[in-house]
Regions:
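Flexible, small-residue-rich N-terminal segments that precede or flank a structured functional core
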Residues: 29, 35, 42-112, 201, ...
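Residues that flank catalytic or metal-binding motifs in active/ligand-binding sites
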Residues: 101-103, 120-122, 139, 173, ...
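Signal that preferentially marks extracellular ectodomain short beta-strand elements
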Residues: 106-116, 177-183
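A short beta-strand element within beta-rich, extracytoplasmic domains
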Residues: 107-110, 117-133, 222
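Beta-strand-rich interaction/scaffold domains
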Residues: 130-195, 213-216
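Acidic glycine-/aspartate-rich tracts in secreted/extracellular proteins
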Residues: 131-134, 199-201, 228
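Short beta-strand-plus-loop segments that form exposed binding edges in beta-rich domains
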Residues: 195-212
């Protein structure tokens, strides 16, 4: 993408639009905007690409509908409440539930909106670390979104199911999962606030336990590439 530079006081060339120049709109100072004609289209020339990571602020696992979709703070889960998970707990581990489980991952959505305000989203990625799975060779992660406002919900919520799927190839493995760009748009536009893990059924293939925010560098995080 083309860009514009100007000569600084010491003879150095400074790129416009890099946070060092503002223009007045009569009321406030704002980043400059400019376009050039490439012979076919007008191209914005003062935009910059940014890649920001947002570490989750909280996370948790939830029971299925047979226990009211409540968090693992209730009853006796074999996994600590901070672990988001999905899929069937029975018969592999826990006879207490006949159905699958869910997970919710929370972010500082206001901070994300502050970064993305006015931005064009180019790529959205989610980092997950699979601590455990029913099978040694892994399984399938099913990713959704939620719009809970606050640091913690005691009941599982989801507004978009199955927005992305990813194959994990074993226990104690991690990956960046590409999400649709509209997930970033919805975060920017205050339509969603976080991520869910939620298998469709009681299949062991979708039984995966993910690291939560108490697991240090293994904690879930979002990486968003955008231009503004």
């Amino acid at each position: 993408m083309p860009f514009v530079k100007y000569r600084g006081a010491n003879g150095e060339w400074i790129k416009l639009g890099g946070g060092n120049v503002r223009v007045s709109n009569g009321h406030t100072w704002i980043p400059p905007r400019a376009r050039i004609w490439d012979g076919h289209n007008w191209i914005k020339c003062l935009e910059e690409k940014h890649v920001d990571e947002f570490v989750a602020t909280n996370s948790g696992g939830y029971w299925w509908s047979d226990h009211g979709n409540v968090s693992h703070n209730h009853f006796n889960s074999l996994w600590a409440p901070n672990y988001p998970l999905q899929g069937n707990y029975r018969p592999y581990h826990d006879r207490f539930s006949n159905n699958g489980q869910h997970g919710m991952i929370y972010f500082n959505d206001q901070d994300i909106r502050n970064h993305l305000a006015g931005a064009r989203i180019e790529r959205v990625e989610l980092f997950l670390y699979a601590v455990h799975s029913a099978y040694f060779n892994g399984g399938e992660a099913v990713i959704g979104t939620h719009n809970f406002r606050g640091g913690w919900s005691d009941v599982f919520q989801e507004v978009n199911h199955g927005v992305a799927r990813a194959r994990f190839y074993g226990r104690n493995t991690s990956q960046w999962i590409v999400l649709p760009n509209w997930v970033g748009d919805n975060l920017r536009d205050n339509l969603i606030s976080g991520i869910t893990t939620n298998g469709e059924n009681a299949s062991l293939w979708q039984y995966i336990v993910f690291a939560g925010t108490n697991q240090g560098w293994k904690a879930p995080k979002l990486r968003i590439t955008y231009v503004k």
